UniProtKB/Swiss-Prot annotation:
InterPro entries listed in its UniProt record: Ac76_baculovir
UniProt protein name: Uncharacterized 9.4 kDa protein
Superkingdom of source: Viruses
Pfam families (UniProt xref): Ac76
Length: 84
């Protein structure tokens, strides 16, 4: 939301500042500059969240133990249900 507000404010500022025919060129120059300055912040924010989403070694071992327990429970339930 703040990004769109910033880009809109810069667009209005650039069009008001330069009232000549090349105002559009100046407008696009400002937008490209803002995009280049802001994009590394978004890229670094996405890589940090991706690193936090990766499961740790402990989480992997806990998940594997849970899967083994579920498989053994399924085998035991199958064997006891066949006796009934």
């Amino acid at each position: 939301m703040h990004l769109y507000l910033l880009l809109g404010a810069l667009a209005v500022f650039s069009l008001v500042y330069d009232k000549k025919e090349n105002g559009i060129v100046f407008y696009f120059l400002i937008l490209v500059l803002v995009f280049v300055l802001i994009s590394p912040a978004f890229i670094s924010k996405n890589t940090e969240s991706a690193a936090n989403d990766l499961p740790s070694h402990k989480a992997k071992s806990v998940r594997k133990k849970l899967e083994i327990e579920q498989a053994l429970d399924a085998i035991l339930n199958k064997n006891t249900s066949s006796l009934d």
